């Protein structure tokens, strides 16, 4: 399966897997910018992609940035639809207490290519019963007892 990538800027870095068994391709910033504490920024990557049929790209945080700097992807996972052909941008948010400097070439997120199942929506008067029912938002408790 091929992911077609166009560099929109000469200095853009192609997404790549670091290890042969990685799930996500690293995405890199194309410019320097600073994210103050509590704020978010759209970080450009300088690339556009053409996804294989019936797939999406999920933009996810990098665990090292989250743990060491409290930087994460704001709308995680960000969804890139199959038909989108514009620049891939990553919305990073700084949950830390210090400003964070994004530098050109820095790995800022990872992109996972995933299959998409499209469904036909059917309106019904009633849904089937289950043991869970409408219980949600913590209804199963916090412990594994």
Swiss-Prot record:
Q: What class of enzyme is it?
A: hydrolase
- Pathway per the UniProt entry: Pyrimidine metabolism; dUMP biosynthesis; dUMP from dCTP (dUTP route): step 2/2
**Matching Pfam families:** dUTPase
Chain's role? This enzyme is involved in nucleotide metabolism: it produces dUMP, the immediate precursor of thymidine nucleotides and it decreases the intracellular concentration of dUTP so that uracil cannot be incorporated into DNA.
Q: Can you tell me which residues bind substrate? A: 62-64, 75, 79-81
Its family remark reads: Belongs to the dUTPase family.
Task: Name the keywords, alphabetized.
Answer: Hydrolase, Magnesium, Metal-binding, Nucleotide metabolism
In its UniProt record, a GO molecular function of this protein is:
dUTP diphosphatase activity
Query: Which protein are we looking at?
Result: Deoxyuridine 5'-triphosphate nucleotidohydrolase
Catalysed reaction equations from the record: dUTP + H2O = dUMP + diphosphate + H(+)
- Keyword Magnesium tagged: yes
Q: Note whether Metal-binding occurs among the keywords.
A: yes
Cofactor(s) needed by this chain: Mg(2+)
**Please, which domain of life does this record's source organism belong to?**
Bacteria
GO terms in the biological process aspect are: dUMP biosynthetic process; dUTP catabolic process
What are its E.C. numbers? 3.6.1.23
């Amino acid at each position: 399966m091929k992911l077609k990538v166009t560099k929109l800027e000469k200095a853009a870095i192609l997404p790549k897997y670091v290890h042969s068994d990685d799930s996500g391709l690293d995405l890199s910033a194309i410019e320097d910018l600073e994210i103050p504490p509590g704020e978010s920024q759209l970080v450009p990557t300088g690339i556009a992609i053409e996804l294989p049929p019936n797939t999406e790209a999920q933009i996810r945080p990098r665990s090292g940035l989250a743990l060491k700097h409290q930087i994460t992807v704001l709308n995680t996972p960000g969804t890139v639809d199959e038909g989108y052909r514009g620049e891939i941008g990553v919305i990073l948010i700084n949950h830390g207490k210090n400003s964070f400097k994004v530098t050109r070439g820095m790995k800022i997120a990872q992109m996972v290519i995933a299959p998409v199942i499209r469904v036909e929506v059917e309106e019904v008067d009633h849904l089937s019963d289950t043991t869970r029912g409408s219980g949600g938002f913590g209804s199963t408790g916090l412990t594994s007892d």
